[in-house]
């Protein structure tokens, strides 16, 4: 992974990563923290993952951390929606309501895909959040991780 990061950085590309798994974050916390602080430009995490990463108890601590590292941190919060923090710019979106949730498999991945689709197409942050929410809302209403 280090060579891939080095190559992307050398080519002036943005590097995005999802923390993806609470167990991995807890087990490899210091490695993840180094990546988040020093190697990544865009970080995706759910609320539990970001709190575990920084040993925080409150969501306000996660927001403060995200502002301090000066990266684009996107945190999904389930029924509370999602938030993007990039230095002092904070954008939030509510979760869609009245969904028939069947399976959460792939929700974070599809959210990240939608958000990144917005980034590469020069959407503003709010529209990136909307696209991510749109895709994740579709996948959780099906069994399995394919739309």
Please place each PLM-identified region on the residue numbering.
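Ribokinase/PfkB-type carbohydrate-kinase core domain
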Residues: 1-91, 123
